[in-house]
UniProtKB/Swiss-Prot annotation:
Residues with glycosylation annotation: 105, 152
Name of the protein described by the UniProt record: Gamma-interferon-inducible lysosomal thiol reductase-like protein
Disruption phenotype: Attempts to generate homozygous knockout mosquitoes were unsuccessful, since gene disruption interferes with both male and female mosquito reproductive biology. Partial knockdown results in severe defects in reproductive system development. Underdeveloped ovaries. No yolk accumulation and oocyte development after blood feeding. Developmental defects in testis. No significant effects on male accessory gland development. Altered expression of genes involved in oogenesis, 20-hydroxyecdysone synthesis and immune responses. Reduced expression of ZPG gene, a regulator of germ cell development.
Swiss-Prot/TrEMBL keywords: Glycoprotein, Membrane, Signal, Transmembrane, Transmembrane helix
Transmembrane portions of the chain: 218-235
Record membrane topology: Single-pass membrane protein
Additional observations: While mosGILT is an abundant protein in Anopheles gambiae salivary glands, it does not appear to be present at detectable levels as a soluble component of saliva, suggesting that the interaction between mosGILT and Plasmodium parasites potentially begins at some point in the salivary glands and then allows the protein to travel in association with the sporozoites into the mammalian host.
GO terms assigned for molecular function: oxidoreductase activity; oxidoreductase activity, acting on a sulfur group of donors, disulfide as acceptor
Organism for this UniProt entry: Anopheles gambiae (African malaria mosquito)
Expression sites by tissue: Salivary gland (at protein level). Low-level expression in midgut (at protein level). Expressed in head and leg tissues. Ovary. Fat body.
Swiss-Prot/TrEMBL induction comment: Up-regulated in midgut in response to a blood meal. (Microbial infection) Infection of salivary gland with Plasmodium berghei does not affect expression.
InterPro entries, alphabetized: Interferon-induced_GILT
Length: 241
């Protein structure tokens, strides 16, 4: 009975220490090479691995700007008109992607990140039209037509304007793209760390930290506490065997 209790305590300790979640806002542009590199090589793999510890908010606007004339919204984008359209596709995807019965174990958030990752990769190849449908086919989402209709309508403009307002609330204009803000607060040192090693930046902001952060240097007292708990429980269990 004591053995089972100690084993459950060990599992409980590890589980509890892996449940912290931090809001992360990523401000990016649909045709920005630096944004694509960051999302494809850093954000995507880390967010997939640590999704239980990450509340991800994607904000596709970057250094764009907008003006309004009545109900019309006109955008000027860092990489030209095509990027304005691409930003609208991203904004519409974030709004319209839903989970589906064909992928019951994949959430709306998972599908959205998969789709955005594909869009950023494919758009950099510059091999034709913006990859709205191609990525929808690859990721297996059903809402590509709704995304297309949205991007080509006032809905897309309004959604992109909302992302612009979120961006301008952080910085107007952004100092650099992509920008990563934890808890929607800009920190210059965290920004530098995020773009060089997003995993380190995320783990630094998790308290207590999950086991996925154990292999990183300077993991802090939270990891030491977790290691101590698990070690003590392991020793107690070994003495009972």
């Amino acid at each position: 009975m004591l053995f089972k209790s100690l084993l459950l305590l060990s599992v409980y300790a590890v589980t509890c220490y892996g449940q912290s979640k931090v809001p992360v806002y990523v401000y990016y542009e649909s045709l920005c090479p630096d944004s694509a590199r960051f999302i494809n090589e850093q954000l995507y793999p880390v967010a997939k691995e640590l999704k239980k510890n990450l509340e991800l908010h994607l904000v596709p606007f970057g250094k764009s700007s907008y003006t309004t004339q009545g109900s019309d919204v006109m955008f000027t984008c860092h990489h030209g008109e095509n990027e304005c359209y691409g930003n609208k596709v991203h904004a519409c995807a974030i709004q319209h992607i839903q989970g589906n019965s064909y992928q019951p174990n994949i959430s709306k958030e998972d599908l959205t990140l998969d789709y955005v990752n594909c869009l950023m990769h494919r758009a950099q190849l510059k091999d034709g039209a913006f990859p709205t449908k191609r990525c929808a086919d690859e990721v297996k989402i059903d809402q590509w037509q709704a995304i297309m209709d949205c991007a080509n309508s006032t809905e897309g403009s309004q959604l992109l304007k909302q992302h612009g307002d979120v961006t301008n609330k952080l910085q107007s204009p952004l100092k650099s793209v992509p920008t990563v803000a934890f808890k929607q607060t800009y920190d210059d040192e965290l920004q530098k760390l995020s773009v060089s090693s997003f995993r380190h930046a995320l783990c630094k902001n998790l308290s207590p930290q999950p086991v996925e952060c154990l292999d990183l240097p300077s993991t802090g007292s939270a990891i030491s506490s977790l290691g101590m708990i698990v070690t003590v429980v392991a020793v107690l269990i070994s003495r009972l065997l």
